[in-house]
Swiss-Prot record:
One of its GO terms (biological process) is G protein-coupled receptor signaling pathway. A lipid is attached at residue 3 (S-palmitoyl cysteine). This is Guanine nucleotide-binding protein alpha-5 subunit. The gene is gpaE. Belongs to the G-alpha family. G(q) subfamily. Guanine nucleotide-binding proteins (G proteins) are involved as modulators or transducers in various transmembrane signaling systems. InterPro entries: Gprotein_alpha_su (IPR001019), GproteinA_insert (IPR011025), P-loop_NTPase (IPR027417). It comes from Dictyostelium discoideum (Social amoeba). Transmembrane segments: none annotated. Mg(2+) binds at residues 42, 176. Residues 30-43 are annotated as: G1 motif.
Length: 347
């Protein structure tokens, strides 16, 4: 009996040690966050800052996002106005004609922000022509997922004492270029997470991140099954995700690496799948406008790509929902513990 307890205690100590150990002297578990552009990777990355032990963005850190948020408001209204003009839509309110002209020429960065610009955005967002063109998003033009959130909150942003909230920070968008790195502790385990640019031009920078990875978290935007790439408008976004996952999961770099798929933007997908049939873009799907049927079909498409023996775990996520990501990351932590336990007992 004492011998069994000693063996079990040793295994427990080994698991604890291995989970904290990375190659060399670093006491961290290395997570590689991969996926195509706009799959929600960077939002997941920011969530880690919030859900970590004693986490969250400080006031000073949130203030640094102000001009990013201002820039998001301006750039997304410019997209809408440009799309409206291209479709020959005129503003309902004659006063907005000059605003159409202004936003067709405006520089989209946060440096263009003024209280007058904030009022322009408020008036344009309430115009029927802009609302009509907004409903055409994903068909004729590409708009960020959080555009409506920013427009709805424009009055708050215009306050001279405005301090971004955690939600504002999560919804803000800056294209990831190169490699972003963060160190955080979650339930007493040290993690090192690397977020790399998802656009095609950024993927060549991934290669040197592949060494000593404990797990790959691969993000897929469920809601983009009917959308095309910004870089190549003839390529379906979900098909691009499938191609990328196929390349990564079957790479020799990851033969012994755990894979965790985050099927992200589940909230947007639930709204869209009730109106737009997945079968229009993936003819093998015959499950109709069913959320359950469509999510299981998509999940199977990805899981079937693996030709190796890796264990692949899947979670349906909403990256802007902190409670959801905290719940999912508890499961991810348990997955890593079990993976290391299985490695030790099979050693």
């Amino acid at each position: 009996m004492g011998c069994i307890l000693t063996i079990e205690a040793k295994k427990s100590r080994d698991i604890d040690y291995q989970l904290r150990k990375e190659e060399g002297s670093k006491n961290e578990t290395k997570l590689l966050l991969l996926g195509p552009g706009e799959s929600g990777k960077s939002t997941i990355f920011k969530q880690m800052k919030i859900i970590q032990d004693d986490g969250g963005f400080s006031i000073d850190e949130r203030l640094e996002y102000r001009y990013i948020i201002y820039g998001n408001c301006i750039s997304q209204m410019k997209v809408l106005v440009t799309a409206a003009i291209s479709q020959d839509l005129k503003p309902n309110n004659p006063d907005n004609e000059t605003r159409f002209e202004k936003f067709s020429k405006i520089s989209p960065g946060g440096n263009s922000w003024t209280l007058e610009i904030a009022e322009d955005i408020k008036q344009l967002w309430s115009d029927d022509s802009i609302q009509n063109i907004y409903r055409m998003k994903d068909k004729f033009y590409q708009l960020n997922d959080s555009a409506a959130y920013f427009f709805d909150n424009i009055g708050r942003f215009a306050n001279e004492n405005y301090v971004p909230t955690q939600d504002d920070v999560l919804r803000s968008r800056v294209r990831t270029t190169g490699i972003q790195e963060a160190h955080f502790k979650f339930i007493n385990i040290e993690f090192r997470m690397l977020d790399v640019g998802g656009q095609r031009s950024e993927r060549r920078k991934w290669i040197h991140c592949f060494d000593s990875v404990t797990a790959v978290i691969f993000c897929v935007a469920l809601s983009e099954y009917d959308q095309t790439l910004r870089e190549e408008e003839s390529q379906n976004r979900m098909k691009e995700s499938l191609m990328l996952f196929d390349e990564i999961v079957n790479s020799h770099w990851f033969r012994n690496t755990a894979f965790i798929i985050f099927f992200n933007k589940v909230d947007l997908f639930r709204e869209k799948i009730a109106k737009i049939d997945l079968g229009d873009y993936f003819p093998a799907y015959t499950g109709g406008l069913s959320f359950d049927n469509s999510t299981q079909f998509i999940k199977k498409m990805f899981l079937d790509l693996s030709t190796g023996n890796q264990r692949i775990f899947a979670h349906f996520t909403c990256a802007i929902d902190t409670a959801n990501i905290q719940f999912v990351f508890h499961a991810v932590r348990e997955t890593l513990l079990k993976n290391i336990f299985n490695t030790i007992i099979n050693y």
